[in-house]
């Protein structure tokens, strides 16, 4: 090891000077050979008192938990302060954005309500006009039906009046009998199944 250090220290003067490495006391590396006096030595760990070991282990555990809790508390406090510092500006910005978005949505809602109201009014007007037209058509059809019914009844009345002229009444009974007797027309005949007329 000293030879390697000496080789590192002995450099030509053309290069910049480097700090001189000196051997120091300390642990050997795993690649260094053991001393001659310690070849074959078996190291035995010192005896440990179980009660003392348990107490030390418990105290170290408590110490680690306490330090971990303090570290976590300090970390949370620092993060909370950073968050509050950032959230102050962000919260104000978000509030402003929310107000602006709310105003835009309210304006859009008013425009949409106005448009829907105009469409509703136009639809109601069209429906009212359609109902009026339908009502007028129904009245005209009803009037035509009534007029046709009146004409039919008038025709029936005229027909009955024409037929009533040939009715036999008490006043014209004798005259109709005389007329039938004086008529040369004979009703004494019949029709067979074959359609032939048989006269007597």
Curated annotation (Swiss-Prot):
InterPro entries: Ribosomal_mS26 (IPR026140). Pfam families: MRP-S26. It is found in: Mitochondrion. Residues 1-44 are annotated as: Disordered. Its main location: mitochondrion. Residues 1-27 form a transit peptide. The keyword Transmembrane helix does not apply. GO terms for cellular component: mitochondrial inner membrane; mitochondrial small ribosomal subunit; mitochondrion; nucleoplasm. GO terms for biological process: mitochondrial translation. The modification N6-acetyllysine is found at residue 159. Component of the mitochondrial ribosome small subunit (28S) which comprises a 12S rRNA and about 30 distinct proteins. Belongs to the mitochondrion-specific ribosomal protein mS26 family. This is Small ribosomal subunit protein mS26. It comes from Mus musculus (Mouse).
């Amino acid at each position: 090891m000293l030879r390697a250090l000496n080789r590192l220290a002995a450099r030509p003067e053309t290069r910049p000077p480097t700090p001189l490495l000196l051997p120091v006391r300390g642990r050997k590396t795993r690649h260094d050979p053991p001393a001659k006096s310690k070849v074959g030595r078996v190291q035995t760990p010192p005896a440990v008192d179980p009660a003392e070991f348990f107490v030390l282990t418990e105290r170290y555990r408590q110490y680690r938990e306490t330090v971990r809790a303090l570290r976590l508390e300090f970390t949370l406090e620092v993060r909370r302060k950073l968050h509050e510092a950032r959230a102050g500006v962000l919260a104000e910005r978000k509030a402003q954005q929310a107000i602006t978005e709310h105003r835009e949505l309210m304006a859009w809602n008013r425009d949409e309500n106005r448009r829907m109201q105009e469409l509703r009014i136009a639809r109601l007007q069209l429906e009212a006009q359609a109902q009026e037209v339908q009502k007028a058509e129904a009245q005209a059809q009803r009037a035509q039906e009534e007029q046709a019914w009146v004409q039919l009844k008038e025709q029936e009345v005229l027909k009955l009046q024409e037929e009533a002229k040939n009715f036999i009444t008490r006043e014209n009974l004798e005259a109709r009998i005389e007329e039938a007797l004086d008529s040369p027309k004979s009703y004494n005949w019949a029709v067979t199944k074959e359609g032939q007329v048989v006269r007597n």
